[in-house]
Amino acid sequence: MKLPFTVDLNGKVAVVTGAGGVLCSEMAKALAACGAKVALVGRTYANVAAVADEITAEGFVAKAYAGNVLDRAGMEAVAAEIESEFGKCDILVNGAGGNNAKANTDKEYYEPGDIDAETKSFFDLDNDGVQGVFNLNFIGTLIPTQVFAKQMVEKGGSVINISSMNAYTPLTKIPAYSGAKAAISNFTQWLAVHFSHVGIRVNGIAPGFFSTKQNAALLWNADGTPTARTEKILRATPTGRFGAADELIGALLYLVCDEAAGFVTGITIPVDGGFSAYSGV
């Protein structure tokens, strides 16, 4: 892959959760291209294995591991396996996350009469759906950090959490996901302070809108034309387009590089085409 710049990660071990997805698979590839031995962790082994195969085909070092970020014992078993093959973790990218339609509202605004309408409003949000979104995003960041940061406390390291522009201003219709990502940004700051005396830097990246498999149904009609929500998103994004997955790589490499960002901890960098800066007028 073509990198915006390179950093020297030779001798480093990087663990990427959610590595089978569009965004974090690119992050895993970039870390490997810079010399890190990369462990790709995902709930669906076939997805992370395919990415690992792409990386090794380029001559870099990577291996796929099946793991559920909500299973503490399972994560500890994966960590032990990674340590035996690659060594202790130096870089952790907490990329697992997602939303659930049961935690969404159908409409942007609650209107008079909606209480009796055939529409899912705030009052109809499914508790299990909401809890699932918070678990996947927040607990799915907490548990891997508990497991892999334990390997860093004697030598230092870097943790990268994946937040969202939702953390700055929540998007309509997705209250649980917005709240969960706001929690990730807050947690990033908390972790940065907590680990500051043992050389573990903790930072975040807040992607704007990227077209992925996960959100394709929200962004594109069956015939490939943009949905009304896509048109609204692009009007609210000063650059007027979606981001490309490789446009997250510059922020990632900067944050994991001790020489470039050794005094940087507790920040979350928005990579959103100006979305979080635009008031709409």
Sequence positions of predicted segments:
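C-terminal substrate-recognition "lid" of short-chain dehydrogenase/reductases
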Residues: 241-271, 276
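Active-site helix of classical SDR
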Residues: 145, 180
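Conserved glycine-rich cofactor-binding loop
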Residues: 20-22
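Substrate-binding pocket helix/loop in short-chain dehydrogenase/reductase
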Residues: 103-122, 126-131, 233
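Conserved glycine-rich Rossmann-like NAD(P)H-binding loop of the short-chain dehydrogenase/reductase
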Residues: 36-50
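Short, small/polar-rich loop/turn modules that mediate ligand/substrate recognition or access, typified
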Residues: 196, 201, 263-265
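Residue(s) in the substrate-gating loop at a strand-loop-helix junction
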Residues: 164
